[in-house]
Swiss-Prot record:
GO terms for biological process: chemical synaptic transmission; neuropeptide signaling pathway; sensory perception. It comes from Cavia porcellus. Residues 1-24 form the signal peptide. This is Proenkephalin-A. Residues 163-184 are annotated as: Disordered. The record marks 111-113, 133-134, 215-217, 219-220 as: Cleavage. PROSITE patterns: OPIOIDS_PRECURSOR (PS01252). Keywords: Cleavage on pair of basic residues, Cytoplasmic vesicle, Disulfide bond, Endorphin, Neuropeptide, Opioid peptide, Phosphoprotein, Secreted, Signal. Proenkephalin-A is cleaved by CTSL to generate Met-enkephalin. Belongs to the opioid neuropeptide precursor family. It comes from the Eukaryota. It holds the Pfam family Opiods_neuropep. One of its GO terms (molecular function) is opioid peptide activity.
Length: 268
């Protein structure tokens, strides 16, 4: 009997609390159902709450609400994932705006659209070098492999132009035989025609030592030949009447006053 009395007292004490919690849960569920419906007025909130509490016979309002709540609970994980994605994107855009200032505000939408149109797969990110080689057909790889050949070809050009030393030339002839063959294969014999005879190279060496390569071009320029053809030796005959250095000295001694007066302007 004592146990029954204790149980009854506990039920009396906890009954109002349980009823309050049940009422609160029922009111929350009915409110959620009315919120989910397209027309909230179609659901009788009071009848739904009373049916949930068991105080009113079932009119299929609470059953409809339960079905709607189950469907909404199944959709909640997807909505939660989408909300997490949106929040992550917002945080990422916020960090980018902090890092790059107003640049991402102006061009961020464009870059985002490009990423959506042309997404990058993880395999492509991992194998970026292979994608570049596929896209450019091994062009960069070929340039990297031909770096030594280009260096050797530059040494060969220096040698042909006469800018290298004798020691460098000897070392190049000893060590760079393979590079010469590679250059000849690459340029199809074009560099072969630039080789000079020994006599011309000796003259070039002397000019190189004397003038530093500035006066390597020997002979009159083309414009002088055209000028000579145009005036037919007139300048040559005029040059005969001009006083030489010795005659100029005697002429200056004979007429010092004119020299002083006109400063050599009337010498001719």
């Amino acid at each position: 009997m004592a146990r029954l009395l204790r149980l009854c007292t506990w039920l009396v004490a906890l009954g109002p609390g349980l009823l309050a919690t049940v009422q609160a849960e029922c009111s929350q569920d009915c409110a959620a159902c009315s919120y989910r419906l397209v027309r909230p007025g179609d659901l009788n909130f009071l009848a739904c709450t009373l049916e949930c509490e068991g105080q009113l016979p079932s009119l299929k309002i609470w059953e409809t609400c339960k079905d709607l709540l189950q469907v909404s609970k199944q959709e909640l994980p997807q909505e939660g994932a989408s909300s997490l994605r949106e929040s992550g994107k917002q945080d990422e855009s916020h960090l980018l705006s902090k890092k790059y200032g107003g640049f991402m505000k102006r061009y961020g939408g464009f870059m985002k659209k490009v990423d959506e149109l042309y997404p990058v797969e993880p395999e492509e990110e991992a194998n970026g070098g292979e994608i570049l080689t596929k896209r450019y057909g091994g062009f960069m790889k070929k340039d990297a492999e031909d770096g030594d050949a280009l260096a050797n070809s530059s040494d060969l050009l220096k040698e042909l132009l006469g800018t290298g030393d004798d020691r460098d030339r000897e070392n190049h002839h000893q060590e760079g035989g393979d590079s010469d063959e590679g250059v000849s294969k690459r340029y199809g014999g074009f560099m072969r025609g630039l080789k000079r005879s020994p006599q011309v190279e000796d003259e070039a060496k002397e000019l190189q030592k004397r003038y530093g390569g500035f006066m390597r071009r020997v002979g009159r320029p083309e414009w002088w030949m055209d000028y000579q053809k145009r005036y037919g030796g007139f300048l040559k005959r005029f040059a005969e009447f001009l006083p030489s250095d010795e005659e100029g000295e005697s002429y200056s001694k004979e007429v010092p006053e004119m020299e002083k007066r006109y400063g050599g302007f009337m010498r001719f």
